[in-house]
Amino acid sequence: MARITVEDCLTKIPNRFQLVLAATYRARMLSQGHAPKVESKNKPGVTALREIAEGHVGLEMLRKVPV
């Protein structure tokens, strides 16, 4: 299994603060029962980072956050 790092995700979302917000929101969605977009047996936080690194999820996650 390949290890996922934040550096892998920073190529997709260059701003580290936006990266954390997007990953957190996606991880919360996964823990509430949403279907993952990648094959993963990891915890929601790691799965969210994998989705970002592979380009399945991006900054659009921040547009879905209720104000």
Swiss-Prot record:
Catalysed conversion reaction = RNA(n) + a ribonucleoside 5'-triphosphate = RNA(n+1) + diphosphate
User: Any one Gene Ontology biological process term?
Assistant: DNA-templated transcription
The protein's matches in SMART domains, at most eight in alphabetical order, are given as: RNA_pol_Rpb6
What are the entry keywords? DNA-directed RNA polymerase, Nucleotidyltransferase, Transcription, Transferase
Instruction: Name the Enzyme Commission number(s) assigned to this protein.
Output: 2.7.7.6
GO MF terms listed in the record are: DNA binding; DNA-directed RNA polymerase activity
Any one GO CC term of this protein is: DNA-directed RNA polymerase complex
- Keyword Cell inner membrane listed: no
Record keyword Transcription present: yes
- Top-level EC class as recorded in UniProt: transferase
Q: Name one Pfam family in it.
A: RNA_pol_Rpb6
Q: Which family does it belong to?
A: Belongs to the RNA polymerase subunit omega family.
Give the NCBIfam families listed for this entry: rpoZ (TIGR00690)
Q: How does it assemble?
A: The RNAP catalytic core consists of 2 alpha, 1 beta, 1 beta' and 1 omega subunit. When a sigma factor is associated with the core the holoenzyme is formed, which can initiate transcription.
Q: Which PANTHER family does this one have?
A: DNA-DIRECTED RNA POLYMERASE SUBUNIT OMEGA
Q: What does this protein do?
A: Promotes RNA polymerase assembly. Latches the N- and C-terminal regions of the beta' subunit thereby facilitating its interaction with the beta and alpha subunits.
User: Could you tell me what this protein is called?
Assistant: DNA-directed RNA polymerase subunit omega
> Upper lineage ranks?
Bacteria, Pseudomonadati, Pseudomonadota, Betaproteobacteria, Burkholderiales
